[in-house]
Amino acid sequence: MVVPFKNEPGIDFSVQENVERFQKTLEQVKNELGQTLPIVIDGEHITKDDTFDSINPANTSELIAKVSKATKEDVDKAFESSNKAYKAWRQWSHKDRAELLLRVAAIIRRRKEEISAVMVYEAGKPWDEAVGDAAEGIDFIEYYARSMMELADGKPVLDREGEHNKYFYKSIGTGVTIPPWNFPFAIMAGTTLAPVVAGNTVLLKPAEDTVLTAYKLIEILEEAGLPKGVVNFVPGDPKEIGDYLVDSVHTHFVTFTGSRATGTRIYERSAVVQEGQTFLKRVIAEMGGKDAIVVDENIDTDLAAESIITSAFGFSGQKCSACSRAIVHSSVYDEVLEKAVALTKELTVGNTVDNTFMGPVINKKQFDKIKKYIEIGGKEGKIEIGGEADDSTGYFIKPTIISGLKSSDQVMQEEIFGPVVGFTKFDNFEEAIEIANDTDYGLTGAVITNNRENWIKAVNEFDVGNLYLNRGCTAAVVGYHPFGGFKMSGTDAKTGSPDYLLNFLEQKVVSEMF
């Protein structure tokens, strides 16, 4: 009997003993940096001469790992391995596959601090965010294992005289997982192992910036006894193998989290039926957001300011759920803005090894992109605080608030994916909802209000997949807040939901006559 699902706890760093233990873990992980990571195909670890570097975004002189680059030939071998493994893996019972996932979760739990420390170095994650990422990975795995057990017997359908009918679920085949760098363990583990527990096999192409974090999962899968070939590990240059993975006649599904441009490209290419392809590919895509917090009149302005700042600047704003737009009633606009600026002044920015609130942004490309948007925002509105950027040692950008913006302004329309939030005002709640919906995205949103009528209006009209009342718009919790968005935010395949595994299953009906 499996115990009920329970979320994995974080670590309380207000306890000095926990701080000291994690500092030791950071030192241990630091001593292991700089190794060459292999590709892994059919259980074989293959080190390549052709590599790329994963570096510490907080200290760009520090090498995290050299990463072997998979070629198209390697991808072909990986598909061959996965197709072969699928024949046996799909025959495992739902219960046995779920129990293996629970074993994986138990090993991650034992190594949680190690995995968290890797993310501090490789992704520039603050301590709490890194531990939360590892814990969420455990949550996804535990949740999906139980979901598979619940689906094991299918769903009841009607019988009639002389006829017995069964409705049940079966696996699809081999697929491709392309996870992001911003939740390099949680999303990577969840989007890899959800299809696996459903009986499918996967080629995992990790994000180039966080390959070591993904490789830790490969180590754990091997320790847990996952049969070789069920997950093949193919890090590489997306320009060389990205389209090749998506286009393959062997790819039954693609699960992707990342940019809108890449997501829509995957969606388009997956719609093309290749020669020899006898099925339609499925795409499960999450592509970002332009998330807003709407602040009504007659509210707690401290709550409003704190909700905005926490949601905007946690992990340097590098969350698809991050607040990048504050839409504030004109009667409280000045007060909320003033308090938000005051809170921002208190934030610490620096190398997250030192447990700062904010660390770097992930790489030079993102650094330059965010700098450009700050320059644009300074022309469209007024920079109230922040705006400074320094890449002399790492990719650091100060938390930035831009006021006096219009909904049509570029920084209020386009996803920045950095520590930048724009403020605009409204005079009535209907106008607020119009502004909130005035983007191509629809992922998360929040409303700070004491007016029940306005809240109901937001529930019905604020066009986002995840909507929160009187709190920030980040920090969805597995089992509580299934996560996914509308419009150009993706396919709304809610991760951590009772329905998520259905993306990787086919429904079959068997009618037996007597």
Curated annotation (Swiss-Prot):
GO biological process, one term: proline catabolic process to glutamate
Active-site residues, record numbering mapped to chain: E286, C320
EC number: 1.2.1.88
UniProt pathway annotation: Amino-acid degradation; L-proline degradation into L-glutamate; L-glutamate from L-proline: step 2/2
InterPro entries in the record: Ald_DH/histidinol_DH (IPR016161), Ald_DH_C (IPR016163), Ald_DH_CS_CYS (IPR016160), Ald_DH_CS_GLU (IPR029510), Ald_DH_N (IPR016162), Aldehyde_DH_dom (IPR015590), Proline_metab_enzyme (IPR050485), RocA (IPR005932)
GO molecular function per UniProt: 1-pyrroline-5-carboxylate dehydrogenase activity
GO CC list: cytoplasmic side of plasma membrane
Superkingdom of source: Bacteria
Keywords: NAD, Oxidoreductase
Chemical reaction(s) catalysed: L-glutamate 5-semialdehyde + NAD(+) + H2O = L-glutamate + NADH + 2 H(+)
Assigned protein family: Belongs to the aldehyde dehydrogenase family. RocA subfamily.
HAMAP family, alphabetized: RocA
Protein name (record): 1-pyrroline-5-carboxylate dehydrogenase
Organism: Staphylococcus haemolyticus (strain JCSC1435)
Gene behind the chain: rocA
